[in-house]
Amino acid sequence: MLALFLGSLSLIPFLLIVCTAFLKIAMTLLITRNAIGVQQVPPNMALYGIALAATMFVMAPVAHDIQQRVHEHPLELSNADKLQSSLKVVIEPLQRFMTRNTDPDVVAHLLENTQRMWPKEMADQANKNDLLLAIPAFVLSELQAGFEIGFLIYIPFIVIDLIVSNLLLALGMQMVSPMTLSLPLKLLLFVLVSGWSRLLDSLFYSYM
């Protein structure tokens, strides 16, 4: 039992990605960098570090609640039934977080798929609170939300690219790369509107 528990600790990086805010935050930061046009600044490691720090901020209340429950319901490694019962109580805050930030349409779609793909006895018992449904539904919802945010982020930067391209064309300066002028303008716009702060604030508020 102890070996099983220690082995489960190796799943922590996986759970960090699929059960927390990390996926959407990291996606949004990477899409923002690509939208601006600076492919390697900040570097991937820096963006993942920012995403991890932001995830810790978002997940702090959930982690605090889990910590409190661990103190109230110590994990009994010597008894499988007690361990399962304790784990169910301990992970409830995380499951509540995922459910709160999951698109109901995604849950309904997955429930429909269980009727087609799972054995009848499993499908009949499936409900939206099962971790087997909650985790993939949360991941799909985060992916969808991340791409929606990315689309909105791209719009102003595409407008700048179009304006610069048309301006150069009108001036007969086709030999000048539009990126040469649009990149500084996009960086200036992002700095003037406090882009990083506003972006992270929007991500934080999306989990309220």
UniProtKB/Swiss-Prot annotation:
The chain crosses the membrane at residues 2-22, 46-66, 149-169, 176-196. It comes from the Bacteria. GO terms for cellular component: plasma membrane. The keyword Membrane applies. Its main location: membrane. It is found in: Cell membrane. It holds the Pfam family FliP. Keywords: Cell membrane, Hypersensitive response elicitation, Membrane, Transmembrane, Transmembrane helix. It is a multi-pass membrane protein. GO terms for biological process: protein secretion; symbiont-mediated perturbation of host programmed cell death. PROSITE patterns: FLIP_1, FLIP_2. PANTHER family: FLAGELLAR BIOSYNTHETIC PROTEIN FLIP, SURFACE PRESENTATION OF ANTIGENS PROTEIN SPAP. Belongs to the FliP/MopC/SpaP family. Required for the secretion of harpin. This is Harpin secretion protein HrpW. It comes from Pseudomonas syringae pv. syringae.
